[in-house]
UniProtKB/Swiss-Prot annotation:
Keywords: Cytoplasm, Methyltransferase, RNA-binding, rRNA processing, S-adenosyl-L-methionine, Transferase. It comes from the Bacteria. GO terms for cellular component: cytoplasm. This is Ribosomal RNA large subunit methyltransferase K/L. InterPro entries: 23SrRNA_methyltr_KL (IPR017244), RlmKL-like_Mtase (IPR000241), RlmKL-like_Mtase_CS (IPR053943), RlmL_1st (IPR054170), SAM-dep_methyl-trfase (IPR019614), SAM-dependent_MTases_sf (IPR029063), THUMP_dom (IPR004114). Residues 42-153 form the THUMP domain. Signal peptide: none annotated. The gene is rlmL. Belongs to the methyltransferase superfamily. RlmKL family. SUPFAM superfamilies: S-adenosyl-L-methionine-dependent methyltransferases. It comes from Xylella fastidiosa (strain M12). HAMAP family: 23SrRNA_methyltr_KL. Its EC number is 2.1.1.173, 2.1.1.264. It is an enzyme of class 2 (transferase).
Amino acid sequence: MRFFVSCAKGLEYLLVDEVLALGAAGATATVAGVNVEGGLCDAQRLVLWSRLASRVLWPLAAFACADEDALYAGVAALPWVEHVLPGQTLAVDAHVSGEAITHARYAAQRVKDAVVDTLRDAGVVRPSVDVEHPDVRLNLSLRKGRATLSVDLGGRALHHRGWRQAPHAASLKEHLAAAVLLRAGWAKVYAEGGGLLDPMCGSGTLLIEGALMVADVAPGLSRYADPDAMSHVSVAERPVLLPSRWRGFDVVAWEALVVDAQQRARRGLAELRPVLHGSDIDPRALGAASANARAAGVQDAIEFVVAGIDVLPAVSEPHGVVVCNAPYDVRLAADPGLYRHLGDALRRVVPRWRAALVCGSNTLAFATGLRAGKRYQFFNGALECVLIVCDPVVPLAREAGGAQALSEGAQMAANRLRKNVQRLKKWRIRAGVECYRVYDADLPEYAAAIDVYQEVDGARRLFLHVQEYAAPTSIPEGDVRRRRHELLAAVRAVFDVSVAQVALKTRQRGKGGSQYGCFAQRGEFFHVCEHGALLRVNLFDYLDTGLFLDHRPLRGRMAREAVGKRFLNVFCYTGVASVEAAVAGAAATTSVDLSSTYLHWCTDNFALNGQGGVRHRLVQADALAWLEAERGQYDVIFCDPPTFSNSARADDFDVQRDHVRLLRAAVARLTPGGVLYFSNNFRRFRLDVDAVAAFAQCEEISSVTIDLDFSRNTRIHRTWLLWR
């Protein structure tokens, strides 16, 4: 006999394995479920034992269904006196797709009408409706003009285990928790003496499911436990009710299954070791977790501690599994920073453990900074999630700072990196440079720019920012990936950093040309220093980092010239030039940008250096329009526009087309003796010398604004000095 077992999307193949392990003759995955070959006893065993299934549906009939009349007739043709006893309660669930019948509730009503009418005509007391706890629950699937009517052998959704005493916001459903534990290989780790840790355990779902799984407790024992039984009685001793009172249900087989399951539960609970650890920052959540664990009979195996992720509970087991349903969407606004802190904590406390983390998206998974060996998609209700498995949290080759053997290509790249580091060493020490470009496509086959950022506080970590250049379409994608991995291996080996300290921006080929792929969204900011100013940078979340390294010498020159003067920075980005001018002693600064994000970043940079107030003004505006309306005068002006920009709040800007208008407006704001520095990185830019000569004197000074680390690419930007 073929019957259907439904599950959450993404769990189908796990469910196939479970169904076969529980004795079914065959199983085939389909969307959100599994078609199973087996008998009624096999189906009832799944009701009792499956940790993954949502429902077990035993078919009663399948028939063509062109419209509501055909549906009614098909249902009425069944001998309902053989399925429903007089006076029993009934419920009908319906799932419809297609054009014949479009409303599931109406379809369910027509099924109920057909059943009731048939029983009434047979002289049987009609069943009443009980949608919560019916004696018999029917399930209608109507798809592509064909109806399948089944009896729901479990009587209710099987993710209900019966032990949950107190609901908790956005708890992971129990069958999804079981899937996480199975993907993590928890049972095998437990058998080898390992432990289980959930640092954001909430109401304890993952830990309780983990305990019941290794204790060999069937989920159906607590789900169908007699509610009148004493709550202090072990789940292995409580009377177990029938999940369905459908007349075809094999009561004798069910009772035999229950007796066997209770015997196994007694043994498993008696031998269960206390190696499960949970923590959460919310004491109320832990109160619910403790109550749930008591109801499940596993309270002695789980230790609950009130703590945030920065203070993980101490674990004595040398190895184990970390599981976590990190907050996303409904429970808390998705916070990449929280995911980053989680990854940092796991690397620090349990580097050799395996981790299986439920994340709200791939972006949030990337934010952990952990290297996922495996990645799975599934649905928690309507929410699509990603499960990452990291085994171990810190790979052995990474823990020692990248001591793994390098391939021939990676070794070649590493040699070039070491050579560049040595070449720049004396200059960096003399100039006090801590953030610099160490590589710029020196080897053509490894086409990327690599920048080094030295953290100035905390652990003084070293970070690497790797920006891959677009590969020619003639190069196979496999070669592109191989070279990328070799270059990253070289970076980690030379600079002795973990994968979490390397930010990679890759180019992805598409119809619109090469575009950078999605960024990590780790929310990880740290501080660096340039020319005595502290600066906030983020290597992971944006295309740029908050600090254009190539403008370093120009910023230093302007800061020296701005001492005691008024400094204007248009298209200010994160305001680094303004901050350095303020730190150097500028009398006042004005910073203009259209982006509120960058202006907030600029505000943070000023605050880091104890600067701010009315002397340092930030203006959110279209820079060109603001310049043309401004009447103030400035001694030093810095103008570094983008090549092109468009915005719903401002006119489109094209540096080649609009630079004369821009420079005219900026020069008009200069005081007598004032200077304007104009820079851009458009490689094909041509200054309209004749037009500019009509209102200013001009000199190109690009060569003196390029430091040694950018000497391989002197076209990284061009700079002109203008004065009246």
